[in-house]
Amino acid sequence: MRKTYPDLRSFLNVLEEEGQLVKVTEEVMPEPDIAAAGRAAANIKNGPAVYFEKIKGYKYSVVTNVHGSWANHALMLGMPKDTPTKEQFYELNRRWDKFPVKPKVLGREEAPCKEHTITEDINLFEVLPLYRINSQDAGCFISKASVVTGDPEAPENFDKLNVGTYRIQVKGKDRVGIQALAFHDIAAQLEKAERKNERFPIAIAVGNSPLVTFMASTPIKYTQNEYEFVGALQDGEPCEIVKSDLYEHLYVPAGAEVVLEGYVEPRVREVEGPFGEFPGSYSGSRKQCVVKITRITHRTDPIFENLYLGIPWTEIDYLMALNTSVPLYKQLKADMPEVVAVNAMYTHGMGVIISTKCRFGGYGKAVAMRLLSTPHGMPYSKVVIVVDEYVDPFNLEQVMWAITTRVKPDKDVAIIPNCPGMPLDPSSVPAGMHTKMIIDATTPVDPEPNPREVEILDPPAKSEEWEAKIRELLGR
């Protein structure tokens, strides 16, 4: 079994060899067949990727549920497909420390994503087999692309190159809308461009190597580069990238199936959504930025990779599980070395379970509050459960045992109102605000011993005399 994959196709080959990919050879309807298969595959334990060879009305193929099981997730890491989730967590944690690994920049002629170029009469529907994912979506959405942008104030700073996953609504043959929420890196960059009333360069890579997609969905620091993390997670093997055709400072995955290049027109907003989102409900509509596509490059017979979102668990829950858990663990561990593990696999970290050794009374609550102040925990995390170091946070039976036998509801549950929240959460009212809850299910630790009654300190002898003398010296 190979350990790393330069592109989506090499990973699909391994999935097929391992019995984790099924091919549908008969022609299917884009709606509802593709989304229905994505939902169905997620319902099956260790569900496979589903590859559709023929889509009615379209030229090219579609694959879904590529990351949609722990078996596929393990194969992505080059591990046996039966590797337990907790072992995958610790393996990711080990590789995380290899960051940064500089990417390998290929020439244009070496990059598969540059095999074909379209600059005139651009029509996204001729390149991508687009479809609605859920029946009440506002239109066709691209749900699994890696969006590449730079910092307008420091475009040559590679550390500030952002590769992120954001939902993309197709608004026309050469126009798309992108949801850029306030706490997303892309929103901070767009704001800088709009302050100068400048067009915001953008590249959208569709169908990437599994770890590029994985890192594009990972909450890391603004100055940490996703491509350098891909190299780390590939155990030191560099990620292959290539320069954008339109912008000197943007780099895209060299093995991408399709790359859309263009710009965001400054200060232009259009209604985007509704869209069936990862919490399992429709998100409603908001005014979002609009991208004009001016160039497309693609591989021969490109594969459109998309994912289904619905009531968990679906592919997105596997994709955004351990890559949320590991950075939160690293951030907590740096300040609180007693932390043993973090399970943030539930609804993209809206629910988090932390295991830790408690140094003193109230330590469990302190760990939870630290998590709620991290860049991801602040807007996303809503319910935080803390358990002892010997409780496995990835074993819900153990976690429930800790809650039912350790928690005193009047002392161990903290409710924190009026906090930043994830606006896509249907319980966030008004949108973007949350009430957070901490459940401290750790074994109580004795406070510092204090056997005496409180003794009030008397001032030292002659304090009044010295006060008078100091006033005299001051002339007061």
What are these regions (language model features)?
Residues 1-275, 280-290, 294-476:
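Extended, highly charged
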